Amino acid sequence: MKPLHEILKRPLVTEKTVQQEGEAQVVAFEVKREANKVEIKKAVEQAFEVKVKNVNTVLVAGKVKRLGRTYGKRSNWKKAYVTLAEGSSIDLFGV
């Protein structure tokens, strides 16, 4: 298995993910594109000491951006929605 810091890049904190975290115990992460669901599940369970119920992944296409007269493209990336088991929670901010 790859090291944890290579699989989990960062948590995604948006209005939608904060609402899902409160209602359905779903936490979103940006993960390495090559990571599969089993690796993501093990990484989250190891890093945060929680039980994971389900993992859903989405490949997000990079946007085309304009740089003056030329066009560039941002990299594609992978998003993982991790559903936690009952009684488990992740405190991302430590507040």
Swiss-Prot record:
One of its GO terms (molecular function) is rRNA binding. It comes from the Bacteria. GO terms for cellular component: ribonucleoprotein complex; ribosome. One of its GO terms (biological process) is translation. Keywords: Ribonucleoprotein, Ribosomal protein, RNA-binding, rRNA-binding. Belongs to the universal ribosomal protein uL23 family. One of the early assembly proteins it binds 23S rRNA. One of the proteins that surrounds the polypeptide exit tunnel on the outside of the ribosome. Forms the main docking site for trigger factor binding to the ribosome. Part of the 50S ribosomal subunit. Contacts protein L29, and trigger factor when it is bound to the ribosome. This is Large ribosomal subunit protein uL23. It comes from Syntrophotalea carbinolica (strain DSM 2380 / NBRC 103641 / GraBd1) (Pelobacter carbinolicus). The gene is rplW.
